[in-house]
Swiss-Prot record:
Classification via Gene3D superfamilies: 3.90.1200.10, Phosphorylase Kinase, domain 1 (3.30.200.20)
Enzymatic class: transferase
Protein name as annotated: Homoserine kinase
Gene name tied to this protein: thrB
EC number in record: 2.7.1.39
Amino acid sequence: MAVYTDITDQELEAFLEGYDLGAPLAFKGIAEGVENSNFLLETEKGRYILTVYERRVKAEDLPYFLNMLTWLADRGYPSARPIPTRSGATLSSLRGKPAAIVEFLPGLSVRKPTAAHCREAGEGLAWLHLAGEGYPGRRANDLGQAAWSPLFSKHRKAAEDLKPGLSATIDNDLAQLSLMWPRNLPTGTIHADYFPDNVFFQSNGKFAAAIDFYFACDDAYAYDVAVTLNAWCFEADGSFNITAAKALLNGYERRRPLSPIEKEALPILARGAAMRFFLTRLADWGSTPAGALVRPKDPLEYERKLAVHREGLVLFA
């Protein structure tokens, strides 16, 4: 989450006239993430999150995301239910940009996940995959494997500026991923951005909720697991924590056992997931607006993860 669009008190009051939430009592920006402008909103009727959609989020995709949040909440999954306007719409407009209000979810994210957190996060991810079954909305993964080479072609110079010689290494990775990418895996609704800052825990360390579904799409469940392994199971020194990874997979399989083909595919999926986040961080590196309350994330963190995955992971003995 982040803040790119500033909202005045007068603009907020006019916007809230479209909702049955009472008068605003408190309002502040949330300076995390890189995608949208997010605000913590407190009104006479409770606490909420107001999001103004920016950058990569396409307006035509927003009904998919918001309807999915409602679908998940209706099925008992702890996701932020969208709040409808007085006319029943979940999508509105603020400062000429799409905007929505969702429920505030209790819980806290963790900066240094333990193996126990990883186990809980894994189970929460499997719960999400099961709760999403049957969701009628459809959205292709526009940051999936087919998008990586075109995206890199736009940012080759940035890669060389970061690390001379890196573009040739990435070219080789992309060629190998294209040849080795698994097909025909079980698919459905995935989160695609299930990072520690998008998962909340209760005070006792139990899974509480998942947030920030704005990369959600239809893709392989095991790819979502691979994204999560990369996000949760690397140490600050760049080493892969196999204990945390096995805990995460154990938690996932408490609710949804992985099939043999999914287990076999995980190492190459993890390499591809590292490529995806390297490339989007590379794209963000030179394009974050000046003055935004957020710093772009380091692409080289995911280049180092790519280097680990080139050696191959042994996740299942």
